[in-house]
Amino acid sequence: MRKSKKILAVTLAAAMLCSVLPASQANAAVKHKGVCSTLKNGVLTISGKGKMPKNMKFRGNTKIKKVIIKKGVTSIPDNAFKSCKKLQSVSIPNTVKSVGSYSFYNTAIENITIPKSVKTIGAGSLCNCKLLTTVTMPGKFKVYAPNPEKNEDIMSRYDNIKSVKLNTILDISNMKYFSAMNVYIWNKDTKYKSYDGVVYSKDGKTVLGMPLKRDELAVREGCTTFDVQAVAYDSVSKDSDTFACGSLRKVIIPESIEKVVDSRNLLSKTKRAEFKVEDIIVKSKKLDGNSIALLSTCFNHIETEKFMKKFSNQIKKEDGMYISNDNVLVKYDGKAKNVVIPSYVKEIADNAFYTANVESVDIPDSVTKFGKNIFELSSIVKVNLPKNMKTISEGMFKNCSNLVDVKIP
């Protein structure tokens, strides 16, 4: 009887050691139905079945140099290895489904493979890893943020990650999380393909995603469509609707580009991206008025006159209005308070009078198409609409606080 009690006591003690003992003290493997940890000669081995307990954290442990998580473990908790400053190597099995927030924050890992089984990745999980250069990870995942008031970055734009290599199909909205110089698409992805670390459609005809750390985007010759989402991203914080690639300073658009699109309406957001691009080189001579208007909105920090000179063969200026060869009013940048649009204009592009200092605008009957947010944030007071206009376009008078008179024939 005494012998049985002794065995039971030892078993219970081992189980308690396995689940809660810090790695700095656990120097022997202990069998247990849950998840166990063993630290020996700088190698931390985590084994068992199920989730790592929330209290199984090794934060700040400087004895850990390598982490091996065995098959059967299904999750890594928040802050699990945070500030283990000597941790250089991590092995994660394909049974793991979630990686907690700040789990590898401020470690010395140089590369990491997050298996394709992972569906949730915590905010800050790979931030402040100054030696990290290569990340292999899924392209489709959700981000878990323990504090929704803070941003959801999983990598830091201030670190040195050179390449993100995807091991599953890409969810294009996740491009906002890849703070790297290059993103390489999984070779079995049927929708996307990488060229020189930039994401394009599978056929290479549309540029769709630029890695966040690049300072120059040279769109490949042969690409025919420039999608705004290549350089604008959904927000990862509560402070804005979209954000721009903060590193981007130069954009080169080749001769092959025929149109510019905003497939996800990123430029229609209330708090839109603000770019710091210093130079845009446009070699294409095929762009229509709407394409030029989208580029103008996308890079609206560039002085309008300076920007429009890049399209000297495709646009003319008349009374402060930039009008394309296909008769689209692209932008107004004049000083006149009262504007009369010429009778040959057929369309007014998105954001044409955005923030314009105008009081009245006469729109002729020749105009049959109206873009989004035409007068947004302008000082417009009075507008005369054309006879054939049956509906007000989306956001046409958005945030026009001075508007008092809209004449509808």
Regions found by a protein language model. Give the residues of each.
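Consensus positions within tandem repeat domains that build extended binding/scaffold surfaces
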Residues: 78-80, 100-103, 122-127, 154, ...
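His/Asp/Glu-rich metal-coordinating catalytic cores
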Residues: 56
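Beta-solenoid repeat scaffold
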Residues: 59-60, 200-203
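Bacterial N-terminal signal peptides that target proteins for export
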Residues: 1-11
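Structural signature of tandem-repeat unit edges
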Residues: 40-51, 62-75, 85-98, 107-120, ...
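Bacterial N-terminal signal peptides
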Residues: 11-19
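Short N-terminal segments immediately surrounding and downstream of signal-peptide cleavage
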Residues: 31-40
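Sec-dependent signal peptide cleavage junction
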Residues: 18-32
